[in-house]
Amino acid sequence: MNEETMRKVARFINETERELRTVFDRIEEIEYVNQERVLNAFCSEKVSARHFAQTAGYGYDDIGRDTLDRVFAKSLFCEDALVRPTFASGTHAIFTALAGLLESGDVMLAVSGRPYDTLETAIGLDDNPQPNSLIRNGVIYEQVDLNQDGSFDLNGIETALNRLENVKVVYVQRSRGYAWREAIAPESMKPVFDAVKRIKNDAIIVVDNCYGEFTLETEPSSFGADIIIGSLIKNPGGGIAPTGGYIAGRGDLIERIAARLTVPGTGREVGSYAAGYTQFYQGLFLAPHVTAQALKTAVLFARVFERLKLTTMPASNSVRSDIVQALRFNTAQDLVEFCRAIQAASPVDGYVVPEPWDMPGYNDQVIMAAGTFIQGASIELSADGPIREPYTAYIQGGLTYSHGKIAVSRVIHSMIRNGSVRF
């Protein structure tokens, strides 16, 4: 690529960045509010160096673990929380919560359409449900799809609530998974929550909050969610937490889930962590800022692709409720080349060339760019997508906005070399 083309690309990106100043200002205002709330949670719980210590054995009276639970709960507008390094993924945390709340004969009503692929298997929505999946254990699954515009089908939800007996859990997925829709803002969930409390007051509202924490000034718990769940290698870990997940919400429900987390009769009172808790506290403290960096990166990608006349979701000026940006391509090869360009702009394994593969838990081959310090950490700049029509890449994360801007530039360079765009 000649120097003149490279200068044109740099000017193009700088012009795009200037267009986004108002959007970036809004993101920074949200960051400030969230940072102050997290700081207040730390101060309220008198966090000190003793809370970071390593623990071993049963973990009785582990003040680092128990204080971290309370700091997380306050940061997310909740009564209580279980924050555990032992959650292997967000799906693991979600399944633990659902399995702790649902018994044989109970109905799980999903009101945001079909969950994403890995949770489908955990629920038992495959043709042959796996052992220990919810359906194999006697749980009844029902579903109400979203409207075509991505909004809740409130009439359909109310009809289902009136028709079904034994609705124990009403389930909402905040982020899009591999669906072509915007994430659901917490405020938009309130009419559903109100309907649930009016029609089935004893039903438990559970929200998969993955990718959404700290993107707005509120969380689903601000509007009536009973339980919210997420992964520490996404937003709330701040790019620092090396593993884990959280379940937060009503105190009585957290105690019930804790009996499933370990064993009945012991619950949350056990569970040590030999590596110590420093990274989890520090990650939470950094989370509002790192999430804002990821949002700015997503917005820049969106606006650049809009200016290149490609299809994006959400639009660059949309109010965002998660860190994910969807970008649509004409061919499978364009999708693959995009992910390869993201990988090449990564600090870890930047020399690796991603290939589509049969990823456990997914029904189609998936291409993933994940040159991350922490394996699978989608708060770090990463991209992925299933190899199926319409060919869509889902890009998320970015520990620093500068890295995101560099990655945008290198993606454009790759597209020029491949003949996808011209400058």
Please describe what each predicted stretch is:
Residues N2-R21, E28, R37-S44, S48-H51, ...:
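Conserved PLP-enzyme active-site core in the AAT-like
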Residues E306-F423:
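Conserved C-terminal alpha-helix-loop-beta "cap" of PLP-dependent enzymes
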Residues E79-T86, V348-V352:
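Short, well-structured beta-strand/strand-turn elements
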Residues H51, T55-A56, L82-P85, I323-R328:
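Short glycine-rich or small-residue beta-strand-to-loop segments that form or flank ligand, phosphate
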Residues V71:
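Solvent-exposed, charged/polar functional surfaces in cytosolic regulatory/catalytic domains
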